């Protein structure tokens, strides 16, 4: 899978949409994202997944 950098988020697809759970805020206007979305697809070599913080092959 290819990785695309969007600010500090790495995705598998350039237009991938994200959902975050920003339940913690230590500083004003700087939320800490505790979770994101994962994109997976299955091909001949098995399932490949991409998370919001890294790409796995």
Curated annotation (Swiss-Prot):
Keywords: Disulfide bond, Secreted, Toxin. Coiled coil: none annotated. Signal peptide: none annotated. InterPro entries: Snake_3FTx, Snake_toxin-like_sf, Toxin_cobra-type. GO terms for molecular function: toxin activity. GO terms for cellular component: extracellular region. Gene3D superfamilies: CD59. It is found in: Secreted. Expressed by the venom gland. Disulfide bonds join 3-19, 12-37, 40-49, 50-55. Its main location: secreted. Is classified as a P-type cytotoxin, since a proline residue stands at position 28 (Pro-31 in standard classification). Belongs to the three-finger toxin family. Short-chain subfamily. Orphan group XX sub-subfamily. This is Weak toxin CM-1b.
